[in-house]
């Protein structure tokens, strides 16, 4: 049986057009076009962001996308901005969800040591096809990344089913902090710095996210592989690719498996 899996940081629904708009319908169109069986989403929310005000409605992006596209879903908030705007990771799946939970990654002791900080989470869901999916978004602070890697490893070691790990890890493959993760689960790209997944628009985002880039790597090149799909040995990789789209500041990363 074939299985198409996708991870996509949706940038709070804000696209990369010349005049950016908050457009979850654009995200929906990308997902519809690619038609994955399982989708991990990061930066899902409707809070105020950059020049975009919060949506003062009952609109919940994960639920909206799931209903629009016909998927089962689970939303795992990492934080709740202003006590009313949940923000975090989401799972869309064609398979019913048997169980799901949100695991908060322990905060670093020093929350401002070398960059922007916010609490992060890991979504853990067991599907009725026998696969457990983890969806996450690591931070940019060193200790935060270390905590995240350790937390993911502990979760994976407890899981008895085949596993997928989908996420924006805010690290390139050569980052030493990632090494322990490679020892317990297989990276689809085998540690290669490709395909590049961020940013979509190099000229636009290098300036805007210079601080983030410095935390990802000391290197000065712009396009980076920071989005990942990891898998357990039961899943065989058939193909991997990204597509060009301005629906977000990240490119969707797609992997087709044989199971």
Regions flagged by a language model, labelled:
Residues 1-6, 85-89, 93-98, 117-135, ...:
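Beta-strand-turn-beta hairpins that frame and shape the catalytic cleft
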Residues 4-10, 27-53, 92, 132-136, ...:
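Active-site beta-strand/loop signature of hydrolases that rely on acidic residues for catalysis
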Residues 10-13, 45-46, 80-81, 95-97, ...:
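Short, solvent-exposed loop/turn segments at secondary-structure junctions
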Residues 19-26, 57-61, 115-119, 144-151, ...:
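Soluble or luminal CAZymes and related metallo-dependent hydrolases
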Residues 35-36, 69-71, 93-96, 127-131, ...:
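Short glycine/proline-enriched coil/turn segments at helix->beta-strand junctions
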